[in-house]
Amino acid sequence: MPSRVLITSALPYANGPLHFGHIAGAYLPADVYARFRRLLGDDVLYICGSDEYGIAITLNAERVGLGYQEYVSMYHKVHKDTFDKLGISLDFFSRTTNPFHKAIVEDFYLELKSKGLVENQISFQLYSEDEKRFLADRYVEGTCPKCGFDGARGDECQKCGADYEATDLINPRSKLSGSQLVLKETEHAYFHLERMVEPLLAFIEKAYLPEHIRKFVVDYIKNLRPRAITRDLSWGIPVPDFPNKVFYVWFDAPIGYISATMDWAASVNTPDLWKDFWLEESTEYVQFIGKDNIPFHAAIFPAMELGQSIPYKKMNALISSEFYLLEGAQFSKSEGNFVDMDAFLDTYSLDKLRYVLAATAPETSDSEFTFLDFKTRCNSELVGKFGNFINRVLAFAEKNGFRELTCPEALEDKDRQFLDDCQRIVQEAQAYYSKYSLRKACSAIMELAALGNVYFNDQAPWKLLKEGFAHRVEAILFCACYCQKLLALIAYPILPGTAWEIWNMLAPKSLDLENQDKDRVKNLWNTEFIDFSDEVFSLTTPQLLFTIVD
């Protein structure tokens, strides 16, 4: 019976364009996994949406002279266009200004408050008289209270590494205007996360976390403290019965996964369908996020869910990436260290980019994108191994008039060993995808392509054809094409366009392309498709898959 799988990627903040680091961290891995689970025949729902509230949005919208809604709508469209260009196969891309979001955020808050998990508290916060607003930590700097470094950030000193409250800074000032800040009394609602430590630890023990983050998550949960979940802003979801307050963006944003699913259900005219994914314990829920979002997804959002009477689905697996750099430095448009994604895709094919991002994904440690590595991988792996294997086999078949290939009645031992090895690599690739490893999946793809090349070289059908062994040549071509069919299968999650082209050129009897959606190929990774005994290939004119990168 197919499994029901809910997949979410961290909501991109509607405050700027996405770069390769974002894509390699939270979006390509989720897309690859969604495509893989669809191939297995599972009922997959891949959801995402724009995160549209927060002080950074208000400040930047004001700076460029746009209204808040106009500003976030602009970047919502930018993000949607980016995902479309990159082949991110989202089933729905919503936003936190969707018509369902406000009500469910209020419900979460009121439930937590009714259970005594949210209480109001008066505190002193840094306020800018010039800008007439309270400033979040990221917009504050001053002198470190520990080492005396002037220019320390609002929450951490980048010189000595000390962390502190922004109110502990000496001579705090606004990073926006440079004006001195004053302490001003304000009241906020605080979520008593420290009261959720035990249920959170019990929950995390059962969830799948990559080993390199588990200790961090457990330590973080053990040290939870009350956290303000309201802000003094005009842009945000108003807090019930709390005038002039809105919810902190990291309180409302994760709830966006649920409201986005409600939005999707409404879009397909089945308003209650969201419940199949969020209110059924049998659903498998996998989250994909970046490193800096771990605390909110591993502790804060689960705590919010655990505090509800409604049994919302909690994640079964949290897949977090490390940082992805560009030529050894962080992506930064302001500092000129960025890649124009549109210009890049105008120059290079999409699958080249997807492959290199997958092969260098920051799965367990920081990694980087370099143009030299991009060129090397494209030319050596995609052109030299993968593309060469496909092209040489199909070009040879066309040149010599082999169009219809059926499974030979008698396979030689070396053929059977080759076919067994092909199936072994498919099983390995399935294990790699199941464990969320794009890097290892890329290795399996290249291993299978290399295996096919070696087999074709060793059998040397061009020699056999000259010697009059046409039936033997046909058997070799069948085995090579079978390998290519499986190569397209294991490559599809990462190289969907390329896999589709291969299947079109092979036209295998086992695949009805007319009844498949190119972007959502389903129910192929099974014994029927992998079996070769009844296979027939109706070869078409081969097309070059990859070109050299200069």
Curated annotation (Swiss-Prot):
It is found in: Cytoplasm. Its cofactor is Zn(2+). Disulfide bonds: none annotated. Binds 1 zinc ion per subunit. The gene is metG. GO terms for biological process: methionyl-tRNA aminoacylation. This is Methionine--tRNA ligase. Is required not only for elongation of protein synthesis but also for the initiation of all mRNA translation through initiator tRNA(fMet) aminoacylation. InterPro entries: Anticodon_Met (IPR041872), Met-tRNA_ligase_1 (IPR023458), Met-tRNA_synth (IPR014758), Methionyl/Leucyl_tRNA_Synth (IPR015413), MetRS_core (IPR033911), MetRS_Zn (IPR029038), Rossmann-like_a/b/a_fold (IPR014729), tRNAsynth_Ia_anticodon-bd (IPR009080). Its main location: cytoplasm. Pfam families: Anticodon_3, tRNA-synt_1g. A motif ('HIGH' region) lies at residues 12-22. ATP binds at K333. It catalyses: tRNA(Met) + L-methionine + ATP = L-methionyl-tRNA(Met) + AMP + diphosphate. It is an enzyme of class 6 (ligase). Belongs to the class-I aminoacyl-tRNA synthetase family. MetG type 1 subfamily. Zn(2+) binds at C144, C147, C157, C160. Its EC number is 6.1.1.10. A motif ('KMSKS' region) lies at residues 330-334. Keywords: Aminoacyl-tRNA synthetase, ATP-binding, Cytoplasm, Ligase, Metal-binding, Nucleotide-binding, Protein biosynthesis, Zinc. It comes from Chlamydia caviae (strain ATCC VR-813 / DSM 19441 / 03DC25 / GPIC) (Chlamydophila caviae). The keyword Ligase applies.
